[in-house]
Amino acid sequence: AEIKAVFVAGRVDKDKIAISARSKAEVNVQLIMEKLGGGGHFSMAACQVEEKTVKETIDKLEEAIDQYLDERG
């Protein structure tokens, strides 16, 4: 399967995790990042999550991706 989007998450300070998202034209990462309180553009977007663990943040990201895919049909 071809990779259509990538997400990178990392701790940027003690209480903050940043997620950066990039995609090809088929996946609107802006909509996914908006579900986590962020934003951006169709193919480039980001968000910052405070006071969560990396695992909790990745779980929320996976939920947001699943919601996006369900909404797309």
Task: Label each residue range with its predicted role.
Residues 1-73:
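Gly/His-enriched, cation/cofactor- and phosphate-binding structural elements
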